[in-house]
Amino acid sequence: MKASVIIPAYNSKERLYNSLLSLNQQECDEEFEVIVADNGSEDGTLSMLESFQADFPLIFTRIKENRGIAYGRNQALRNARGDILIFHDSDMLAAKDLVAKHIKAHENEENLVVCGLFWKRIYSFYYERFEEEHKEQLAKLTGEMPKKDKQKLLEEADIKNGSFLDKSFDLDTDFIDVLKKILDEYGDDLKGYHMPWRFFITNNSSVKRKHVVDLGLFDEGIVRYGFEDYDLGIRLHQAGLTFRLRRDIVSVHQEHPSNCKSVDDIRANIAYMCDKYNNIRSLDVHLAFNGPFPPDMTNRIMADIQKLLESQKYDMLLNLFLELLHVVKERNIDPDWRKKSPRVTAKSFDLQTVRKLLPKAKKKLGVNDFANALYALVNDLLHVDLRSLDVV
């Protein structure tokens, strides 16, 4: 078996049907299978899977209780036989060449992570629980508002003949804008970009199965919505794999009410990730989630950090930087942070030694961006001007 398409599903029967229908249209000479983990759905997903007429080996497993996306994906992974894993969610519509291009991309590439295009969107159904922004956008696109829940907005013929691609649109958010600007600067090969795992989004990505198995699959400790793909991407990056964006490998997300129950999910996931990667060799994680710096400066800081990591004599600077990013995290995710005792104070660190060491590192290694960032954090969070050690 050349490839296994991994799909977790939860109460998405109608969108999953469309997704499987798009996979039925694949123009691929290689053998591939599709594995669906029904993650405790209550909408008849299992009966749909049992009756679906697939043109490929379709394997599905029923999980009685939803234990998170990571758990569901792992259940599917344990049944996978393919050399290549293609991650493709239940709400995604695959272009006809998606599977073939993912497989082809890994030819003669042992250590590659392929990140397909992930910002295409389409309205295949109307949902009464849509957020207002969805309803406003849908009204602009269609000229009128559908009247009943789960009203079909996309015909099967559109999926079979591929015309759904012409009806799709780009997701327009600050997050996507940031990622597009990163691609403009560093290219689709992401050379020189130190956080390529940010592009590993498991609705359209692939990697050889052996790497995921070696890393212990997805982290089932992540039970709230999101971040399990980031976590695996971080570990793939730390294992030395190369990341590459492929704009020509296209899948389209079928819009639906958000699975994120509240901002608390995001806060909890950030806290979990920062605790898990609480070391100076994972500062990219803390900068990505908590860093108060612009994206271009953030990457330059990471380039400086790579230089500093080459010698243990600068670990004091990096540990201080890490601890201060934890303080930024607590400010960002804890609404009551002002009422609590500070995590650290100026007395928590040997700032006299830091004051002497930082200019030396700056002069020897040219780590100007890191130095400026550390000066700024110490000033803002510890109320100390590190250049003079005068209390502000």
UniProtKB/Swiss-Prot annotation:
Keywords: Glycosyltransferase, Transferase
Domain of life: Bacteria
CDD domains assigned: Glyco_tranf_GTA_type (cd00761)
Transmembrane segments: none
EC number(s) given by UniProt: 2.4.-.-
Molecular functions per Gene Ontology: glycosyltransferase activity
Coiled-coil residue windows: none
Enzyme superclass (EC): transferase
Stored Pfam families: Glycos_transf_2
Gene3D superfamilies, per the entry: Spore Coat Polysaccharide Biosynthesis Protein SpsA, Chain A
Disulphide connectivity of cysteines: none
InterPro entries recorded: Glyco_trans_2-like (IPR001173), Glycosyltransf_2 (IPR050834), Nucleotide-diphossugar_trans (IPR029044)
Similarity field: Belongs to the glycosyltransferase 2 family.
Protein name: Uncharacterized glycosyltransferase YfnE
Species per Swiss-Prot/TrEMBL record: Bacillus subtilis (strain 168)
This protein's encoding gene: yfnE
